[in-house]
Amino acid sequence: MNRRVRPQYDDSDESGVEYESGHDEMEEISFGALNSAQKKIKNEDEKKWSRRNNSNNDSDGEEGDFFESDSDGPPEESSSKTSDQKTRSKHAPAEASAKRPVSRIRQIPGLETKDNSKFGDIRFDPAFGKANEERIRKDYSFLNEYRQSELEQMQRMLKDKKLSRSMSPRERQELELQTQSLRSRLDSMKNKDLEAQVLAEHKKQQKEKWKSGQQAAPYFLKKSEKRKLLQKAKFESMKAPQREKVMERKRKRRLGKEMRQLEFGRK
């Protein structure tokens, strides 16, 4: 009988064939495909690593909360805050932050202050007593000189024809109003000074008469007498043209009053 003999192959030959076939397959793969495969593998590794870290942190936090439940740490504060929020009723009073700027004006309970006196000058505050107007006018008398010089300057500007041509009608009107306002302010201040001077002289005369024995007691003027005395002093201090204007005004007023009385009598 004839026996068939199977051919024998070495393992080295098989491995060599497999290596050659695998090497041929790697050569056929493009560089872009290899690069994308590497990126994909890298992303998967990073995701796995982050999952492991998160699981470790969660386990550590649970263990820390378990072992540090008695300590005053941030976890306990957060849990207390959440519990307060859960237990707080909707009818509870609103909470406001205490970190607010301090007011410059101190609020005193029971003390009422006017809005216009909050930012006033403390020298004229009624809490320090009544203001001495005579002393104030004496201390700030130099301001009248500045006002007078300013009034003269504005009057020169209005009289200057060249300057008035360069100004617009609106600017000229504003300058005239400012001049009129400043003039009336100076006149009112002069009248106040004159009134204070007249009353001070009358008070001085009454005091001297009382000391010399001419009067048993000083005489205090009534409001009507004071008004007449002040009108007389103002009329005497006026110049001739001003006196004529005042007399003309009084004459017209008296004439109008008489005409109204006649018309009323005819009816």
UniProtKB/Swiss-Prot annotation:
Associates with 90S and pre-40S pre-ribosomal particles. Belongs to the RRP36 family. It is found in: Nucleus, Nucleolus. One of its GO terms (cellular component) is nucleolus. Residues 112-124, 160-175, 201-211, 233-247, 256-267 have a biased composition (Basic and acidic residues). Keywords: Coiled coil, Nucleus, Ribonucleoprotein, Ribosome biogenesis, rRNA processing. Residues 59-75 have a biased composition (Acidic residues). The gene is RRP36. It comes from Meyerozyma guilliermondii (strain ATCC 6260 / CBS 566 / DSM 6381 / JCM 1539 / NBRC 10279 / NRRL Y-324) (Yeast). Residues 1-125, 160-188, 201-267 are annotated as: Disordered. Residues 170-193, 242-263 form a coiled coil. Component of the 90S pre-ribosome involved in the maturation of rRNAs. Required for early cleavages of the pre-RNAs in the 40S ribosomal subunit maturation pathway. This is rRNA biogenesis protein RRP36. The keyword Cell membrane does not apply. Its main location: nucleus. PANTHER family: RIBOSOMAL RNA PROCESSING PROTEIN 36 HOMOLOG. Pfam families: RRP36 (PF06102). GO terms for biological process: maturation of SSU-rRNA from tricistronic rRNA transcript (SSU-rRNA, 5.8S rRNA, LSU-rRNA).
